[in-house]
């Protein structure tokens, strides 16, 4: 068998959120990842002298940098795209450090046009990227990756800016000594649980940004018939990644289908093997397999438009919906969620509260 410590070292911090909502375990996992895979500050020498920077910053705009591999057609890019237009240009000078794949798309073009300085750093090693950020004189650098694919945590360990903030990309504490703040809200990090985060907690009313100008219509408009859904039955949907579907939540979905005759569960198409396995689990629970309907891949605009065909979005647990919940709420579909203890398990409840529908936040799995 594998002991708990070995398990923590073997699993990526982001993956752990699919299996547990224990914030202490998540912190330990993130901490171990930083210590073993990234390194500790004593191993890095920062050449920067920030002492004089504060004085020099008086009388000029605050320089804010966003470091991300996802400022493109990606869940994070969709959420953030509208935010860059809203920065107060008289107070802030905005830099984007893009560390993603070299693709061109509408979201990336929009963000690039909205920031004053766009830097491509994917091809730069840590030394070159560090030199670039230091030369730009960034005051606050926002790490929009955290423990996700495309992160440059090693670069952050070398302190490219006096203040480094963990926000949005990774739903949890970095467990690192090189992230000074985490942006949260009263729901994702409830007052009193700050001790489970190595960063200092800063709260907004809701931590997740959204783009109010996002294109949502599709031509032709989607229909239930075209989507393979029954015209007059209740359609429950969950467009979360299948890795978030746990036995705990699937069992409750099957109970809901048993209680709602004719109702269907509309999920995102995964690979054939996963779809068949889910239908097999449904059959084992006494539910006709065809009551699980799988939505094929679609463009983001088409995907958003088809949300309107659903009656209720059912959240997963312990790793809940984040961008997918926002999508549903924007398209007028209520979201049912049962919050857990950790950050990733509480995002959906935060969004549902922000949307003004707290009655859809369940107090227990039974209530769900």
Task: Show the residue positions of the predicted features.
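A conserved nucleotide-sugar
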Residues: 91-93, 254-284, 289
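Conserved hydrophobic helix-helix packing surfaces used for dimerization/oligomerization
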Residues: 62-66, 236, 265
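Residues lining hydrophobic/aromatic ligand-binding pockets adjacent to catalytic sites
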Residues: 292
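Alpha-helical solenoid repeat scaffolds of the TPR/TPR-like class and their adjacent stem/linker regions
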Residues: 1-229, 241, 251, 279-287, ...
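A short structural motif in glycosyltransferase catalytic domains
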Residues: 316-318
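Short acidic/histidine- and often glycine-rich active-site loop of Leloir-type glycosyltransferases
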Residues: 345-356, 361
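Short alpha-helix at the nucleotide-sugar/activated-sugar donor binding site of glycosyltransferases
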Residues: 328-330, 353
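Substrate-binding clefts and catalytic carboxylate motifs of secreted carbohydrate-active enzymes
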Residues: 235-248, 255
């Amino acid at each position: 068998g594998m002991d708990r410590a070995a398990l923590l070292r073997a699993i990526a911090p982001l993956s752990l959120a699919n299996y547990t909502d224990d914030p202490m375990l998540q912190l330990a996992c993130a901490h171990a990842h930083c210590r073993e895979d990234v390194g500790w500050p004593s191993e890095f020498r920062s050449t920067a002298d920030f002492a004089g920077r504060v004085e020099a910053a008086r009388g000029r705009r605050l320089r804010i940098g966003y470091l991300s591999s996802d400022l493109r057609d990606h869940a994070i890019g969709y959420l953030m795209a509208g935010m860059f237009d809203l920065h107060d240009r008289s107070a802030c000078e905005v830099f984007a450090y893009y560390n993603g794949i070299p693709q061109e798309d509408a979201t990336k073009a929009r963000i690039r046009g909205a920031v004053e300085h766009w830097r491509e750093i994917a091809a730069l090693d840590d030394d070159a990227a560090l030199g670039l950020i230091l030369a730009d004189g960034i005051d606050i650098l926002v790490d929009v990756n955290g423990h996700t694919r495309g992160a440059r945590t090693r670069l952050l360990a070398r302190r490219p800016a006096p203040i480094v903030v963990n926000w949005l990309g990774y739903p949890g504490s970095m467990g690192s000594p090189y992230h000074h703040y985490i942006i949260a809200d009263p729901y994702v990090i409830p007052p009193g649980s700050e001790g489970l985060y190595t960063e200092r907690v800063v709260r907004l009313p809701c931590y997740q940004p959204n783009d109010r100008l996002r294109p949502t219509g599709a031509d032709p408009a989607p229909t239930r018939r075209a989507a393979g859904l029954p015209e007059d039955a209740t359609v429950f949907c969950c467009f979360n990644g299948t890795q978030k579907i746990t036995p705990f939540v699937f069992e409750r979905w099957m109970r809901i289908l048993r209680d709602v005759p004719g109702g269907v569960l509309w999920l995102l198409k995964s690979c054939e093997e996963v779809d068949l396995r889910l239908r097999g689990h449904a059959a084992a629970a006494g539910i006709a397999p065809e009551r699980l309907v799988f939505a094929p891949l679609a463009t983001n605009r088409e995907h958003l438009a088809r949300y309107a065909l659903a009656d209720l979005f059912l959240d997963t647990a312990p790793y809940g919906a984040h961008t997918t919940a926002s999508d549903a709420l924007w398209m007028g579909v209520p979201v049912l969620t049962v919050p857990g203890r950790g950050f990733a398990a509480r995002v959906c409840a935060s969004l549902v509260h922000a949307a003004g529908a707290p009655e859809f936040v369940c107090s227990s799995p039974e209530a769900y």
